[in-house]
């Protein structure tokens, strides 16, 4: 069977909007999966969040839908909305008690630089979660909090748990483990800028980096991250033409580094040119992303690049 991504998503939406008896049987699941399909395969953020905000989701009583919305908002620089949903979930005997709500609140508060609230939530997640996923990542975030607060001893203690606790199946846990093994710490200025940017606070993040150049950083990885971070901030602020030169600099500086900055920069340039309607250049940069080896988040970045190529080829 063959078809277009947009046609497949349209069929799911048609099913959601159908009024027949059959559509009610799986409507809950279809409502859960449709925003992910639009986000991950169409690459359309505006369409995704427009659907979430205009659809009759019960984001307090339906934990499945609430998790979907929280996850998407959190991963797309809208930490305040993610935190609002996660904080207003109504407890119910119909659902298992999931520590992942604490993890999401920890992430959201950290991106707001609400460090004490983030620490409490992340500690609650670790204390109550019996699984192995995202444990390394949670411990890394706790180490960052201690590091930012100037408690180096506690930061090192949390980092030792990154090495010994949880597994490294997810990309986030792989990255946390890689960082811990290196034994180095992120530059405090770049870390604060990253967290604010991830939370959706682009102007505050830009203010932290104002007046600096890559020459202000000693480590090669920090020079690459500085270029990438500026590109990402301008990109998220809706200024793609200003983002491209910084992304290009990140590719040039970091193509052979184990960090994800260069590969992600190539992916983002591809997405920018796709939005501009220049499929040829978009494919070139998606392929640049795919060609980079042995870097963090390779699985997820490669998947996004491959999906981008498929979208461009179908246009």
Locate predicted features.
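Terminal, low-structured helical/coil segments at or just beyond the last alpha-helical repeat
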Residues: 179-187, 192-199, 283-315
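Residue-level recognition of tetratricopeptide repeat
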Residues: 36, 71, 107, 144, ...
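C-terminal structural cap/anchor segments
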Residues: 131-141, 148, 153-157, 165, ...
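Structural motif corresponding to the intra-repeat A-B loop/turn of tetratricopeptide repeats
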Residues: 2, 41-42, 76, 112, ...
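TPR-repeat structural position
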Residues: 5, 44-45, 79, 115, ...
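Solenoid-like repeat scaffolds
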Residues: 13-24, 50-62, 87-97, 123-133, ...
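Generic helix N-cap/helix-start motif at coil->alpha-helix transitions
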Residues: 1, 22-33, 58-68, 93-104, ...
């Amino acid at each position: 069977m063959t078809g277009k991504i947009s046609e497949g998503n349209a069929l799911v939406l048609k099913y959601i909007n159908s009024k027949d008896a059959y559509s009610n049987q799986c409507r809950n699941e279809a409502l859960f999966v449709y925003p992910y399909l639009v986000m991950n395969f169409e690459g359309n953020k505006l369409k995704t969040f427009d659907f979430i905000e205009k659809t009759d989701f019960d984001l307090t009583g339906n934990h499945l839908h609430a998790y979907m919305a929280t996850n998407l908002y959190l991963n797309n620089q809208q930490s305040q909305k993610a935190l609002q949903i996660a904080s207003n979930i109504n407890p119910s005997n119909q659902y298992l008690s999931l520590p992942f709500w604490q993890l999401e609140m920890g992430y959201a508060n950290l991106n707001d630089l609400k460090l004490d609230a983030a620490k409490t939530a992340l500690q609650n997640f670790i204390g109550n979660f019996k699984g192995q996923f995202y444990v390394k990542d949670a411990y890394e975030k706790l180490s960052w909090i201690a590091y930012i607060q100037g408690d180096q001893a506690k930061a090192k203690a949390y980092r030792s748990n990154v090495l010994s606790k949880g597994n490294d199946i997810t990309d986030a846990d792989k990255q946390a483990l890689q960082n811990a093994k290196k034994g180095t710490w992120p530059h405090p200025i770049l870390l604060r800028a990253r967290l604010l940017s991830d939370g959706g606070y682009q102007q505050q993040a830009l203010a932290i980096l104002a007046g600096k150049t890559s020459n202000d950083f000693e480590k090669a990885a920090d020079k690459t991250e500085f270029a990438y971070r500026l590109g990402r901030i301008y990109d998220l602020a809706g200024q793609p033409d200003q983002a491209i030169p910084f992304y290009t600099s990140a590719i040039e500086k970091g193509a052979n580094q184990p960090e994800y900055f260069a590969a992600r920069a190539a992916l983002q340039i591809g997405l920018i040119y796709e939005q501009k309607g220049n499929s040829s250049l978009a494919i070139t940069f998606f392929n640049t992303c795919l060609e980079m080896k042995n870097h963090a988040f390779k699985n997820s970045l490669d998947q996004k690049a491959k999906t981008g190529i498929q979208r461009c080829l179908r246009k």
